[in-house]
A protein has these predicted regions:
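Membrane-interfacial loop-to-helix junctions in multi-pass inner-membrane proteins
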Residues: 95-103, 122-137
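Alpha-helical transmembrane segments within multi-pass membrane transporters and channels
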Residues: 111-118
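Short juxtamembrane and helix-loop transition motifs at transmembrane-helix boundaries
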Residues: 61-69, 124, 178-186, 243-251, ...
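Alpha-helical transmembrane segments
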Residues: 2-45, 80-111, 145-169, 190-377
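Membrane-interface helix-loop junction between the first two transmembrane segments
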Residues: 43-61
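Membrane interface segments of multi-pass transport proteins and intramembrane proteases
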Residues: 120-129, 166-172
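Juxtamembrane helix-capping/reentrant segments at transmembrane boundaries
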Residues: 58-72, 126-138, 342, 347
Length: 377
């Protein structure tokens, strides 16, 4: 809105307003606006959630150190989502379709998380939607995003090719080209692409959700991952940088830098209240939304295969759960003392603050590695 008003309408009358045409300027202000909103609304939301008794339920079989957290206000993801959406609407070019796709992902996955959190509160147990219900809703939301991208591909504004790290020329198409001319088979031709998009976005959403088990852990890793994705987005949308690094130049996705900056700013603001000992938890309304948004941005900028490195801790946490469940079903033995992995280290006697800090360090190293791969091609 501010971009439309201050640049598109008024910059011809006042030259300094041309600053609003620069992505870096608007990204910085989007991040600062998100930070200000999160910091300003945080205390109010904490008070309101306490008044409505929207408190976290703690499992009896969980680590004993967590029992003191019972009743801590949850659903703080509402604050994060608002702090992302408002700056994006203010500072982004709203004629850009990729901005709306990213916000659709944030809102739809946030809505799924809200329903899940609300169900947990009503039942006064740590059980919301069933795994099948949640997966179905997430797949539907991601599927809609994939179909929208198929439409953009038809208009020549998006590619269904898969960019493979370390390889410049190898970019397989995730669509059956031979079926595309047949209009009745158009969606079937893009079925591999649609399924891949669903896998990336749903997987990212659930991975962040699994990581959200310690004060500040998930949101700290989100800041790192979102920062790396924001850098990748800016590079993809910048003709000179894209040419230098020999990656696909996608002019319109550059606007997503503002969305990424808003995620970073909102997450930093939320971390102020979520740092150990946490005053508020994000809940599924936050973790599912953030994970879905990160996965969607990765899909939009064609860096899906870099996402496991960008969000390294999220992947490690998710894999630890899969290994634990698979091992128990096949061998009736557990690999870890408890999954996700951060609980395993708690049972080993590590302090919560030490686990969080070390996981942040690993997340930072993974994100840096992801950025270095741009030149290793």
């Amino acid at each position: 809105m501010l971009y439309w008003l201050l640049y598109q309408k008024l910059h011809t009358y006042y030259r300094p307003l041309r600053l609003f045409s620069y992505l870096t300027f608007r990204t910085a202000f989007a991040g600062l606006t998100a930070l200000a909103i999160a910091l300003a609304l945080g205390p109010w939301l904490i008070r309101r959630l306490k008044a409505f008794e929207v408190g976290q339920y703690i499992r009896e079989d969980g680590p004993k150190s967590h029992h003191s957290k019972a009743g801590t206000p949850t659903m703080g993801g509402l604050l994060i989502n608002i702090a992302i959406i408002v700056p994006t609407l203010l500072w982004a070019d709203l004629s850009n379709p990729f901005i709306w796709i990213a916000m659709l992902s944030l809102v739809s996955f946030g809505a799924i998380g809200f329903v899940d959190d609300f169900a947990k509160l009503r039942r006064q147990r740590n059980l919301g939607l069933t795994s099948r219900q949640k997966l179905l809703a997430q797949s539907l939301a991601a599927g809609i995003i994939a179909i929208i991208l198929v439409g953009l591909n038809y208009r020549g504004r998006y590619s269904t090719r898969l960019v493979v790290p370390f390889f410049k020329r190898f970019q397989p198409n995730l669509a059956f080209n031979s079926l595309i001319p047949h209009h009745g088979l158009y969606l079937i031709a893009f079925l591999p692409f649609i399924l891949f998009v669903i896998l990336v976005i749903v997987g990212s959403s659930n991975a962040v959700n699994l990581t959200d088990g310690l004060d500040g852990l998930a949101i700290g890793c989100t800041i790192i991952a979102a920062g790396a994705l924001t850098a990748l987005t800016y590079i993809s949308g910048h003709a000179v940088f894209a040419a230098y690094l020999e990656i696909e130049h996608m002019p319109q996705v550059g606007e997503l830098t503002i969305f990424g900056g808003a995620i970073v700013g909102a997450s930093i603001g939320f971390l102020w209240y979520n740092a150990h000992p946490a005053e508020i938890f994000m809940g599924d309304v936050g973790s599912l939304a953030l994970g879905g948004a990160l996965g969607t941005v990765a899909v939009l900028i064609k860096q899906e295969l870099l996402l496991p490195f960008v969000g390294g801790i999220f992947v490690i946490e998710a894999v630890s759960v899969m290994l634990q469940v698979g091992s128990y079903k096949l061998r009736r033995k557990r690999i870890f003392k408890m999954a996700p992995l951060h609980h395993h280290f708690e049972h080993l006697g590590w302090s919560e603050s030490k686990i969080i800090t070390r996981f942040w360090i690993v997340a930072g190293v993974c994100a840096l590695f992801a950025l270095t791969t741009l030149k290793l091609r």
